[in-house]
């Protein structure tokens, strides 16, 4: 008996943000791919002012009270080592990820806020 796409989607819908991030990382490792959005080349030089923003920067503004949990969340989200993640958290406000799509930016923001950090998406 095989699992249907609907069953997989239902299982993912019941997961926490942290569990989804861990699942994505495991899939990237197992299949040798990345979940990063493909960069599309070309387009108008000036762009359209009314065009919706497609790339976002996730900025850690404050570590909050639970600094250890925030460092763990930063490590999980960025793949940084312990020393690098601690340095980034200590230097807040600091950019965590730049040029990510809206879904990834919002997921990262939710994950870090769940750990106790203050996060801004620009």
Curated annotation (Swiss-Prot):
Key words, A-Z: Ribonucleoprotein, Ribosomal protein
Gene Ontology cellular-component annotations: cytosolic large ribosomal subunit
Any GO MF annotation of the entry: structural constituent of ribosome
One Pfam family, short name: Ribosomal_L12_N
Listed GO biological process terms: translation
Highest taxon in the source lineage: Bacteria
Keyword Transferase: no
Assembly and binders: Homodimer. Part of the ribosomal stalk of the 50S ribosomal subunit. Forms a multimeric L10(L12)X complex, where L10 forms an elongated spine to which 2 to 4 L12 dimers bind in a sequential fashion. Binds GTP-bound translation factors.
Function: Forms part of the ribosomal stalk which helps the ribosome interact with GTP-bound translation factors. Is thus essential for accurate translation.
NCBIfam families assigned to the protein according to its UniProt record, in alphabetical order: L12 (TIGR00855)
Family: Belongs to the bacterial ribosomal protein bL12 family.
Name of the protein described by the UniProt record: Large ribosomal subunit protein bL12
Annotated organism of origin: Aliivibrio fischeri (strain ATCC 700601 / ES114)
Lineage: Bacteria, Pseudomonadati, Pseudomonadota, Gammaproteobacteria, Vibrionales
């Amino acid at each position: 008996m095989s699992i249907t796409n609907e069953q997989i989607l239902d299982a993912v819908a019941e997961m926490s943000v942290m569990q989804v991030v861990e699942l994505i990382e495991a899939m990237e490792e197992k299949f040798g791919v990345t979940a990063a959005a493909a960069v599309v080349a070309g387009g108008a030089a000036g762009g359209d002012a009314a065009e919706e923003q497609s790339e976002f920067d996730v900025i850690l503004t404050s570590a909050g009270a639970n600094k250890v949990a925030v460092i763990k969340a930063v490590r999980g989200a960025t793949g940084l080592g312990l020393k690098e993640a601690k340095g980034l958290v200590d230097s807040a406000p600091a950019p965590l990820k730049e040029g990510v799509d809206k879904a990834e930016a919002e997921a990262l923001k939710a994950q870090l806020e769940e750990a106790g950090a203050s996060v801004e998406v620009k």
